[in-house]
Amino acid sequence: MLKYILTITLTFGMLTTGAKAEDKPELVIYTYDSFASEWGPGPQIKAEFEKTCNCVVTFVGLDSSVGVLGRIQLEGGSSKADIALGLDTSLTSIAAKTDLFLPHNLETRGKLALPDDVGFWDDPYFVPFDWGYFAFNYDKNRLANAPSSFDELLADNDLKIVIQDPRTATPGLGLMLWVNAVYGEQAPEIWAKLAPKLVTVTKGWWDAYSMFLEGEADMVLSYSTSPAYHLIAEEKDHYAAAGFAEGHYMQVEVAGVLKSSKKPALARLFLQKLMEKEMQSILPTTNWMYPAAASGDVPEGFGDLINPAKSHLFSPEVVAQNRDQWVKDWVEGLSQ
């Protein structure tokens, strides 16, 4: 009889616990796979928000930021996502024109710590959460004399490089913008000069970076902050980013609330918390980027990273106007 009572009690307890969990609203966030991964910021961000939101956060990891935007466009107004996280300023104008995003209605004035080159942040749909520079990374044990400019990189016929596709990966898109910012109308010639040095062009960042780590390339397109991971997490100081005399292209990552969300107030609360100290301080040692808000802390290892004297950043509108032609130039240049 006691066994029977215990069984009924435990079963009822499990059912009520499950019911309570189901009663909590679910906040669905589309992002890129490394953000949502167990070693990315996703799990810590989820735990931090769930402390106070009385909700369940679900990250849906897609192959890239470009993939996030593509998924949202495909699903349209029927998307299950409440938030898109991980787009950057090369995609925000295109994203805004889909008419799938709500204004964030958050005050960012005085709360951000973005470089001066970004200017005053007045985007009504997207709030920044981190930023960094694109750079070619190398292993000092394998490459003693890394190029210090695009011109030196292009002149070295022995270099083996791996990059990403701008149509599918944000770093690849960043390189395309970087080259156009530096060389303008000469960009097609630069792609033709770069082509013989390429081991391959990958779909995503990790595909390229893992090839580099396995010794299949001398340099990989990544971020100026990537060496911080090796230094802080692995205690390895032989990975570095090459500082280029022409300057580096900047990336600012953002998040926005979708019109399809049935929980816009909760989604906006998440964006607000994303700019506060607790979440901002998670990002440098999980997403390996600089925090976008003034409240974020940067660990000691970041002081050893390159600090470009010059940076480049097109407005979202310029990217939207020229992206298709620049992609065409990229394809044709690498095909020569």
Question: Language-model segments: which ranges?
Answer:
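Extracytoplasmic ligand-binding site segments that recognize negatively charged/polar headgroups
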Residues: 26, 30-42, 63-67, 80-217
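Short alpha-helix C-terminal cap/hinge motif
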Residues: 43-59
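Extracellular/periplasmic bilobal clamshell ligand-binding domains
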Residues: 300-336
